[in-house]
């Protein structure tokens, strides 16, 4: 008996998040094996799973785990003060089976349909974030899984180096990891925050201070474009679409564009396709397979 046939006999349930006190932005959908699953993001084992005698750190970050899944979506309802998702509940065995299928398929779509609902705090201030040594360390730590995954995945997809541009480079650690994986790559970063740019200049070939809506490099000049600024709590959805268009214009035909981040990506893979970017990957997995995270790898043209 398959996981889905076991679930079909379950009575429906619902998960509710209010806008005033709840966190609708923590609800995620996972499209796998022809069905849509709903889950709620909580703290995950980071960067890897628990091991005997060595429990992992718990961190609320980009990672989602099988235990966070709730059920098979039947419908959702967006009301005046809350969002509700009606679903057929999953047992632990069904969660594990479907999650393993998602881990095995990088085209599995993991997304947050209510990322812009609820009482959210916009993190980005005019002129970028204030940066301290501690906050820079925290940012780099929360990005460790992404830095480990993306360069290897790029190699699997045939990337061999060239010009790599990060439209919101933060401390520069992410693009530095790409440069290390592909020697000879010219790494060019840009960030709204002068403090971030100062840190990035110690790691990258170039780092420019400025808004990503005005990219610092010429059109069609990059072999790889990284977007880590199209996320909830950072920008609005319309702004994310505009920023993607600006960044993607700097990618050459046949080049790669990567979308990811600590918080939900606001641009859908369908929007990317409509913009001339072909999805090669929609989600990434940790080496152990214990967790998934949003990670679009797109080919231009």
Curated annotation (Swiss-Prot):
Q: Which domain of life is it from?
A: Bacteria
E.C. no? 2.5.1.38
Gene Ontology MF term list: transferase activity
- Paired cysteines (S-S): none
Q: Provide an example Pfam family for this protein.
A: Methyltransf_25
> Known InterPro entries for this protein?
Methyltransf_25, SAM-dependent_MTases_sf
Keyword set includes Transferase: yes
Q: Does the keyword Transferase apply?
A: yes
- Subunit architecture: Monomer.
UniProt-recorded name of the protein: Isonocardicin synthase
Task: Give the originating organism.
Answer: Nocardia uniformis subsp. tsuyamanensis
Give the gene name.
nat
């Amino acid at each position: 008996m398959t996981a889905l046939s076991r679930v079909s006999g379950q009575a429906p349930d619902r998960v509710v998040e209010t806008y005033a006190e709840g966190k609708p932005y923590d609800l995620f959908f996972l499209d796998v094996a022809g069905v849509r699953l709903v889950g709620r993001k909580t703290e995950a084992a980071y960067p890897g799973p628990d091991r005997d005698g060595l429990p992992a750190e718990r961190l609320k970050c980009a990672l989602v785990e099988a235990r966070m899944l709730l059920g098979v979506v039947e419908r959702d309802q967006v009301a005046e003060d809350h969002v509700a998702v009606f679903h057929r509940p999953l047992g632990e065995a069904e969660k594990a089976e479907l999650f393993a299928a998602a881990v095995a398929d990088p085209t599995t779509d993991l997304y947050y349909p209510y990322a812009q609902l609820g009482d959210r705090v916009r993190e980005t201030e005019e002129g970028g974030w204030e940066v301290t040594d501690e906050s820079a360390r925290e940012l780099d730590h929360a990005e460790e899984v992404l830095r480990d995954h993306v360069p290897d995945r790029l190699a699997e997809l045939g990337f061999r180096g060239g010009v790599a541009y990060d439209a919101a480079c933060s401390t520069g650690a992410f693009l530095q990891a790409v440069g290390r994986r592909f020697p000879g790559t010219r790494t060019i970063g840009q960030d709204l925050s002068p403090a971030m740019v100062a840190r990035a200049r110690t790691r990258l070939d170039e780092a420019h201070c400025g808004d990503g809506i005005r990219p610092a490099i010429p059109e069609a000049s990059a072999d790889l474009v990284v977007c880590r600024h199209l996320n909830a709590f950072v920008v609005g959805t319309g702004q994310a679409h505009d920023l993607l268009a600006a960044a993607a214009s700097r990618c050459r035909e046949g080049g790669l564009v990567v979308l990811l981040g600590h918080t939900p990506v606001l641009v859908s893979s369908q929007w990317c396709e409509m913009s001339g970017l072909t999805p090669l990957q929609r989600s990434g997995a940790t080496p152990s397979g214990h967790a998934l995270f949003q990670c679009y790898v797109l080919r231009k043209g």
